[in-house]
Amino acid sequence: MAKTKQQKSKPKKQPHQKQGKDCDLSQFRAQLDALGLKIIQVTADGNCFFRAIADQLEGNEDEHNKYRNMIVLYIVKNREMFEPFIEDDVPFEDYCKTMDDDGTWAGNMELQAASLVTRSNICIHRNMSPRWYIRNFEDTRTRMIHLSYHDGEHYNSVRSKEDACGGPARPVVIEADAKVSAASKQAKATESKSKNKADKCHVNAGAIKVVMSGSCCDNTEKAEQVLLQVNGDVDAAIEFLIADQGMESLTENDTETASASDTINPKHASDSPMENTEQAREELIEEESASGNNSETVQAKCTTQTDDKKIPRNKTCPCGSKKKYKSCCGTATGRSSVKLLVSQTMESKKGRKNLRRGTSNEVEANAPDVGALCI
């Protein structure tokens, strides 16, 4: 009885599955046909992923073993990148040895390794589902390998309908995907540019006051210029101005400057900054809690203060540099040198500031995106 039931169930099950797969494949072909693409079937023997890669790059699926060895070797050489993604606690060496055997199915790690070792991006087409992209290279000239994925168990190669299949696959461009990618990059670039521009244009009048008090610098224009260079960071601006004054003092050798230094009141330079700075900080906090001042008001205010204070050129410069005004802040060179000095010293200043505050800055990674292993 058991044997009879088993014989009856076989003919019913097989044609039903075959009909369903044929229907899915027909639907899949129609989906790709709308994009101007066609499926190039490869042998389903456990090597299908490597066969599809070989067809895309050489036009010969029989070269599958060459690409299997190439991909496994890349995984072995980049163990620290791939080992954390091996499942079921399988030892790394055992995994690589098994993957190198003929007929072993490829997984997500092999997809990523194939993209990196062939320096190609990969597009995976799925039946009635969005396309998957493994995009490790942003250069528009990078080759795009096109594969189709069937029922979670088989890969085929995908080519343009006009491709004669006489060699490597011809380049395929899916216009909808290209437009989305370009629009996304442009939007990110525009957002970043506008944010940086807005941050640099706005300098709070209270921040200028705090910087001038903390650094004993009476030159409003110089204080504002430094604040712009450090993106409004009050502590960094104060540290820079103090360091700038110290550097100028060390390089001052002429006797004329030495005699002028006798007129400076040392007590004022050492006692008053702390008190003035604390008071100015409190005023700045109150101002920021209320409505913010716009950049035009700040510029008008700074210009008025500069015009009201006309300093004789032969007098000692009020910025505390111990030099005459005409050879310090009163010259175009003195004003323009601030920008260069800021760029040379800001990294060390920001490092000290972070240690003091106990905070960490967000770092924008410039290194290239290596894509996702788990897709």
Swiss-Prot record:
InterPro entries: OTU_dom (IPR003323), Papain-like_cys_pep_sf (IPR038765), Peptidase_C85-like (IPR050704), SEC_C_motif (IPR004027). Residues 1-18 have a biased composition (Basic residues). It comes from the Eukaryota. It catalyses: Thiol-dependent hydrolysis of ester, thioester, amide, peptide and isopeptide bonds formed by the C-terminal Gly of ubiquitin (a 76-residue protein attached to proteins as an intracellular targeting signal). Its EC number is 3.4.19.12. Optimum pH is 7. Residues 251-264, 290-305 have a biased composition (Polar residues). Residues 1-23, 251-306 are annotated as: Disordered. One of its GO terms (biological process) is proteolysis. Residues 202-250 form the UBA-like domain. GO terms for cellular component: nucleus. Residues 37-161 form the OTU domain. It is found in: Nucleus. A motif (Nuclear localization signal) lies at residues 308-315. One of its GO terms (molecular function) is cysteine-type deubiquitinase activity. It is an enzyme of class 3 (hydrolase). The active site is at D45, C48 (nucleophile), H154. Keywords: Hydrolase, Nucleus, Protease, Ubl conjugation pathway. The keyword Hydrolase applies. Changing C48S: Abolished cleavage activities for 'Lys-48'- and 'Lys-63'-linked ubiquitin (UB) tetramers. Hydrolase that can remove conjugated ubiquitin from proteins in vitro and may therefore play an important regulatory role at the level of protein turnover by preventing degradation. Cysteine protease with a preference for 'Lys-63' over 'Lys-48' over 'Met-1' -linked ubiquitin (UB) tetramers as substrates. Also cleaves RUB-GST fusion. Belongs to the peptidase C85 family. PANTHER family: OTU DOMAIN CONTAINING PROTEIN, OTU DOMAIN-CONTAINING PROTEIN 3. This is OVARIAN TUMOR DOMAIN-containing deubiquitinating enzyme 7. It comes from Arabidopsis thaliana. The lineage of its organism: Eukaryota, Viridiplantae, Streptophyta, Embryophyta, Tracheophyta.
